[in-house]
């Protein structure tokens, strides 16, 4: 329990910390937009490309996500402008002019002080979950070669993210964009399930007897949960943005931050959902497609993905969507049916087992993305040294580093690290299969029940190893 240490407890409860980090990140985000739209068309000399898709992406996938779960959401700048407008305040909690309380437990906003343009509507039930985030991610991923190599396109995509967040903040309650729409938030939430950090209540019984529910409704110390989470029922990381509001507002001192065994949330059976399982399949499929497009030797595939011709891109899009939405899920559906027989779970619907076993793919998927990110960062991070002095590519030399030459870093170590990551992900996924099967009453645990999934996971890992150690070498 990290809140045991007074110094860390004080830091985590500081409202200014969150505001400062978000404001600094917002400055970088706006600079990336301006550089992308107005700066040089050379991606390796443009701040918008280098610092978003290399530096930020490397930090997210290599450090923040595997170690901190939704830690990026704590400082993400995208919701900041909309939230400030929604609250009519930059830092102050409701007792000093905020607008987030009083609220109702059902989530609707009852405040009379809300700025009239911020309607505070509830998000439609039919659109809840992460299906929209799955679709948004697929859209960004499909055009990723264009977005990551053309600064102006990247800049306008970032503008769309910001405009979407502000627009939804003016119409819907709290961080609706983050919870249900953000294309990045979907996979961050999914992979946060394996993170070794969690925010939880200490004793749910205390919450049962506490009628005011300050953690959700807000009080003079802070806002109600921006993520629409009810901490007293929360037992998984997927929808908690680690904003820390409940740490400030809980009058019973019953909310804390813990270190825990990685992957604990994967076994929370009532949290198993088809949209999240599909996200696991989508992320694994894209983790195979990205190294083929960005790192592989297939020039024709790069040309297709880069929109060199409409017919080529059409063929690429068809294959991309088929792999993500049909082929990979279909293979795992077949494996789930075999597992149902092998584990003696014939009374369990195949659909239920298919969804549950989808979560066992999360460790391997995260490892695959870390492996891809490693190649991307090691090969390109040195561009950041020159770009920081000349963010627009206009010949500036702000810090005297403009002329530092590009050179790849640690590339001789990359294959070994990638292999270790993928093998560790494979082992973790197989162990998770066994743990998930044990949650079903009557399952014949052991080698027989695990074999179908283990065979599929091993084949997928071998293919990924070939991509990194063979085809891309």
Regions found by a protein language model. Name each.
Residues 1-209, 223, 229, 244-248, ...:
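Membrane-embedded alpha-helical bundles of multi-pass integral membrane proteins
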Residues 69, 234-237:
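Conserved short loop/turn motifs at secondary-structure junctions
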Residues 214-235:
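Solvent-exposed, extramembrane regions of membrane proteins
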Residues 238-244:
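Aromatic- and glycine-enriched pocket-lining scaffold segments that form the walls
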């Amino acid at each position: 329990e990290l809140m045991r240490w007074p110094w860390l407890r004080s830091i985590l409860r500081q409202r200014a910390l969150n505001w400062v980090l978000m404001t600094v990140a917002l400055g970088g985000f706006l600079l990336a937009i301006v550089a992308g739209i107005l700066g040089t068309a050379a991606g390796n000399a443009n701040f918008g490309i280098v610092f978003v898709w290399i530096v930020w992406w490397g930090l997210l996938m290599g450090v923040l996500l595997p170690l901190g779960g939704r830690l990026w959401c704590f400082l993400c700048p995208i919701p900041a402008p909309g939230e400030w407008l929604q609250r009519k305040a930059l830092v102050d909690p409701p007792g000093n002019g905020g607008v987030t309380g009083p609220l109702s437990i059902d989530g609707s906003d009852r405040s009379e002080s809300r700025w009239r343009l911020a309607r505070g509507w509830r998000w439609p039930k039919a659109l809840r979950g992460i299906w929209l985030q799955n679709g948004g991610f697929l859209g960004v991923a499909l055009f990723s070669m264009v977005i990551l190599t053309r600064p102006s396109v990247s800049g306008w995509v970032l503008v769309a993210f910001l405009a979407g967040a502000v627009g939804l903040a003016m119409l819907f309650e709290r961080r609706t964009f983050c919870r249900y729409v953000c294309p990045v938030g979907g996979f961050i939430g999914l992979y946060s399930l394996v993170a070794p950090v969690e925010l939880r209540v200490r004793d749910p019984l205390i919450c049962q007897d506490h009628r005011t529910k300050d953690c959700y409704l807000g009080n003079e110390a802070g806002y109600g949960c921006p993520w629409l989470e009810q901490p007293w029922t929360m037992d998984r990381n997927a929808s908690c943005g680690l904003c820390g509001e409940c740490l400030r507002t809980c009058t019973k001192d019953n909310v804390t931050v813990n270190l825990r065994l990685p992957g604990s949330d994967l076994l929370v059976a009532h949290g198993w959902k088809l949209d999240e399982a599909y996200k696991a399949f989508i992320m694994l499929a894209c983790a195979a497609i990205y190294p083929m497009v960005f790192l592989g030797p297939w020039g024709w595939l790069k040309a297709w993905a880069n929109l060199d011709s409409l017919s080529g891109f059409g063929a690429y899009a068809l294959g991309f969507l088929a792999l993500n939405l049909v082929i990979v899920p279909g293979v795992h559906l077949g494996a789930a049916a075999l597992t149902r027989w092998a584990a003696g779970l014939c009374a369990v619907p195949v659909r239920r087992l298919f969804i549950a076993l989808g979560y066992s793919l999360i460790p391997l998927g995260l490892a695959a993305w870390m492996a891809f990110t490693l190649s991307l960062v090691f090969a390109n991070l040195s561009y950041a040294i020159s770009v920081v002095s000349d963010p627009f590519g206009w010949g500036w030399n702000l810090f005297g580093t403009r002329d530092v030459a590009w050179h790849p870093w640690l590339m001789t170590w990359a294959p070994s690290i990638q292999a270790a990551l993928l093998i560790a992900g494979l082992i973790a996924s197989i162990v998770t299969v066994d743990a998930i099967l044990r949650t079903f009453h009557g399952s014949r645990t052991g080698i027989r029940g695990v074999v179908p999934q283990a065979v599929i996971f091993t084949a997928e890992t071998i293919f990924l190893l070939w991509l990194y150690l063979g085809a891309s070498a």
